[in-house]
Regions:
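Serine/threonine-rich, low-complexity intrinsically disordered segments
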Residues: 4, 18, 162, 169-172, ...
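C-terminal luminal/periplasmic domains and tails of membrane-associated envelope-modifying transferases
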Residues: 455-467, 473-844
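Ser/Thr/Pro/Gly-rich low-complexity, intrinsically disordered segments
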Residues: 160-162, 374, 378, 407
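Short, low-complexity intrinsically disordered segments enriched in A/P/G/S/L with frequent Arg
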Residues: 165-171, 373-375, 384-386, 390, ...
Length: 844
């Protein structure tokens, strides 16, 4: 351990520190309000809107103490409750934590280690993620850092004032360090219940220090002082202790049991790159972090000839192990509980920094020894002369000793150390930058998109529709974004759920509302019997089912008089395993944006070989898929492998006709396929069953742009027509738009058009894939929608979507290519404009 120098001999370290803190601030505030709040952040919003007394009452019934909510209450009074304002409090705690990493590491090890560890903390995806969340976890990590800082200062002060030989009449204690420990402990305990383990950890470390330094005396008074310190902490926590005991003993443990090596690998991934890491276990990039971690624990011999003090590696190691053991042994190993490990992220960065500088010193020392072949007097130190930090021994008379040369700093060792430093920082930074890029820009790893779901419901919801929140704990965050007129039902209302009461409520809701929008979140805890979704899947007609982060967003139609629908005979077998006996449609006509309801009556000819998926598709005259619904029978409630020969299963389906679908006649088909292989079951003539035609009509009111759910919402105006946006993905992978596109594949293009006037021409488009300046690799041309619905038939304000395929030739090499779009009246050379839609990646 070292004392932090009062004045730096150079301004460079201070400049590096301030630049690192600036980097930390930029990374924590960059796009901080871009992602939607998620459910737990909604709870924070609701708590912050209460009075301080109401917060205390509500927190007593929750698993989180009230301090963070109290601070957030005061914070929003000043800065408001926007996403940015709500999360800014955590961002500031995150910056404080980065500064604390420096203050701790500079005292535990040295300035060089502290600067490197601070840089690692500044760019840590784990710490950045929770710095951009309106929850208490970054504050928890920062308070743990404050406590570690107070402990280190406390021990350093004792190390200075304690006599080396145990003599002396009295010993003093650092008042500042004592105050820091007490305040940080009390604040931490009122922030999160796991902080009790942190207080126990620092107590253990202090006891180890006392045992190690017992020969320096004053053991009893030191233990008494620490005991009084703990009594003060307990006294101020006593008003909340009963609540804490009640919550900790009654809260359910819902962790999962996994092999220890798998858990450790996942935790390493989390500490290194946070919850959005895309690396697989065993990745070479994770090996870099593991290597630096091990090097950080190595007992390096310092430049002064001594081994590093045990506290410099034991404190950060225990600060990692204690929360990890708490999670693994306490039944808390679950994705939603691993955020408790954020308290270990800063100590992890300190050990990474120690691993870098420890090996740097080893390289410097090894190079110095290799070049030092001359007698000791020529190496800058006489044999037996004291090294820095060691007490001097009795020396011979000066006249009998040769003059000592000044110390020599070997340039080879310095260059080797700098090269190692550069390599280590780059190897840590590469996966870190990739992870941060995904976190900031990739919707696939974004938080639960309540903002988007609320906007969609606002755009498409009709006056008689309703919203179901399964679980009710989502209400706060959903109503943060949604202030529309539709009723919101939180189900199940009871905990544990009352199945009979919940089913009765669902039946009444379905009777009153023709369309339901469902937000399904944490259902294993709120609805472990799946009462809500199970009833809806068997009694309503599910139209969509998509993931919005960790929330499933579903839509249902609730037509109840299916017995009155015309029932069509089919009696068509699929590979002699399953037959479609009959089917019924709610109507042969439907408006775009509405749900076509379909009931399929399946009969098992034998026990099916596997669990098949049912598909229903609406096709245009070019066999382009306009609408589609793929799901197991009854959305998984009745898997086919459980069917018995002769059994008839009624399978309700809802097919959402996408807003903007052009008016016209479409073909409806259905069938089954093996989800493992994609292979369809076949009839005698085809691999699908033809269910006849469906007429799609123009809606009375054009859909708002929010209802289109466009992948790329960039607008371009072309005289009479505006392109509102477009979707691009490998054909057949609308549900996975990031599926790699390769040479020979079809790139599916969906264009969303709006007629700004009644068009006076039959407009066509040409889409080109271009390499370099203007080398065309592929192109597709045609009417904006189809020959059957030319733009001359469009009305002013009408929004229409066109579905097209662009063939990627086999000879196209992997790379990124420009996608261009032209509008013309049938002659591609007579264009009115050209726009660049972006770039398309062709993978290997």
């Amino acid at each position: 351990m070292t004392s932090a120098p009062r004045r730096s001999p150079s301004r460079l370290p201070l400049a590096i520190l301030w630049l690192t803190l600036l980097l930390a601030a930029l990374l924590r505030f960059f796009r901080i309000g871009y992602q939607s709040l998620w459910a737990d952040e909604g709870n924070s919003v609701a708590m912050a809107g209460r009075t301080l007394a109401e917060i205390s009452t509500a927190a007593a019934a929750d698993i989180h103490p009230p301090l963070y909510y109290w601070l957030l209450n005061l914070w929003v009074r000043v800065f408001g409750d926007s996403e940015t304002a709500l999360r800014a409090l955590s961002a500031l705690w995150g910056i404080v934590l980065v500064w604390l990493v420096y203050q701790i590491a500079v005292r535990l090890v040295d300035r060089r280690t502290a600067l490197i560890a601070t840089f690692f903390a500044a760019i840590s995806p784990f710490l950045i993620y929770y710095s951009q969340e309106a929850r208490m976890y970054e504050m928890l990590a920062a308070l743990a850092g404050v406590l570690y800082y107070g402990l280190v200062r406390f021990i350093l002060h004792e190390n200075i004032v304690l006599p080396a030989d145990g003599t002396g009449k009295t010993v003093s204690f650092s008042g500042l360090a004592t105050g820091v420990i007490v305040v940080a402990s009390i604040a931490g305990l009122y922030t999160h219940y796991t902080f009790l383990a942190i207080v126990g950890l620092v107590t253990l470390v202090y006891l180890l220090w006392v045992a190690n330094s017992r020969r320096r005396g004053f053991v009893k008074i030191r233990l008494l002082h620490w005991g009084l310190l703990l009594i003060v902490i307990a006294f101020f926590y006593l008003p909340w202790a009963g609540t804490a005991i009640s919550q900790l003993t009654s809260w359910p443990r819902t962790g999962t049991v996994v092999p220890l090596n798998e858990a450790i690998s996942h935790i390493l991934n989390l500490l290194a790159l946070g919850p959005v890491s895309q690396l697989e276990p065993g990745s070479p990039w994770l090996s870099i972090f593991l290597l630096l971690f091990i090097l950080g624990l190595w007992p390096w011999i310092r430049a002064n000839g001594r081994r590093a003090h045990w506290l410099s590696w034991l404190l950060p190691l225990l600060a990692i192990l204690v929360p990890v053991v708490m999670v693994l042994a306490g039944g808390l190993y679950k994705e939603s509980y691993l955020k408790f490990l954020v308290v270990a992220a800063a100590p992890f960065c300190i050990l990474l920094g120690r691993g870098v500088t420890g090996f740097m010193e080893a390289l410097e020392k090894a190079a110095w020894k290799k070049r030092s072949a001359a007698p000791a007097v020529q190496s800058g130190r006489r044999r037996g002369a004291p090294t820095r930090g060691q007490p001097a021994k009795a020396a011979r008379p000066a006249a009998a000793q040769p003059a000592a040369a000044p110390p020599v700093r070997d340039p080879v060792g310095r260059w080797l150390a700098l090269i190692w430093l550069l390599i280590a920082v780059v190897l840590v930074s590469i996966p870190t930058v990739q992870t941060l890029a995904a976190y900031y820009f990739d919707p696939a790893v974004a938080r639960d998109n309540y903002r988007g779901m609320a906007a969609y419901i606002t755009a498409v919801g009709r006056p008689d529709d309703a919203i179901i929140l399964n679980a009710p704990g989502q209400r706060e965050v959903f109503e943060y974004y949604y202030d529309g007129p539709l009723p919101v039902y939180g189900l199940p209302e009871q905990r544990p759920p009352d199945a009979e009461a919940t089913v009765a409520q669902l039946a009444e809701i379905a009777r009153q509302h023709p369309h339901l929008y469902g937000l399904l979140w944490a259902t294993d805890e709120s609805d472990p019997q799946h009462i809500v979704e199970g009833w809806l899947d068997t009694h309503a007609y599910k139209a969509t089912d998509t993931w919005q982060g960790n929330v499933r967003f579903v839509t249902y139609a609730t037509q109840q008089d299916s017995d009155a629908w015309p029932r069509q005979e089919a009696d068509i077998a699929l590979d002699d395993q399953v037959s479609l006996t009959t089917y019924a449609l709610s109507s042969r006509e439907v408006e775009s944006g509405d749900v076509l309801q379909l009931q399929l009556a399946w009969q098992a000819e034998q026990v099916p070989e596997t669990d098949y998926t049912v598909f229903v598709q609406l096709l245009d005259q070019r066999n382009q898929v306009v609408a589609q619904h793929d799901a197991p029978p009854l959305s998984g409630e009745r898997p086919t492998s459980g069917w018995q020969p002769g059994e008839i299963v009624l399978d309700n389906r809802g097919i959402l006709i996408p807003p903007g679908t052009a008016p016209g006649d479409y073909r409806l088909i259905a069938g089954m396929y093996d989800p493992a292989t994609g292979e369809r079951l076949a009839t005698e003539y085809a691999d699908y069953i033809d269910l006849g035609s469906v007429r799609v009509n123009r809606p009375a009111v054009p859909p708002p742009p929010e209802a289109l759910n466009m992948q790329n919402a960039e607008r371009f105006s072309f005289d009479e027509i505006t392109l509102l946006g477009n979707d691009r993905y490998k054909r057949g992978f609308r549900h996975e738009p990031d599926e790699p596109l390769r040479a020979g594949d079809l790139l599916h293009l969906t264009f969303f058009w709006r007629a700004d006037v009644n068009p006076t021409a039959a407009w066509w488009f040409t889409a080109r894939l271009v390499q370099g300046a203007d080398t065309e690799l592929a192109a597709v041309s045609g009417p904006l929608v189809s020959d059957l619905y030319p733009t001359l038939n469009w009305e002013q304000g009408e929004i229409v979507r066109g579905e097209h395929d662009l063939q990627i030739p086999d000879y196209v090499k992997p790379g990124r290519y420009q996608l261009q779009l032209f509008l013309h009246t049938g002659n591609p050379t007579d264009t009115i404009d050209r726009v660049i839609l972006g770039r398309v990646t062709v993978s290997e």
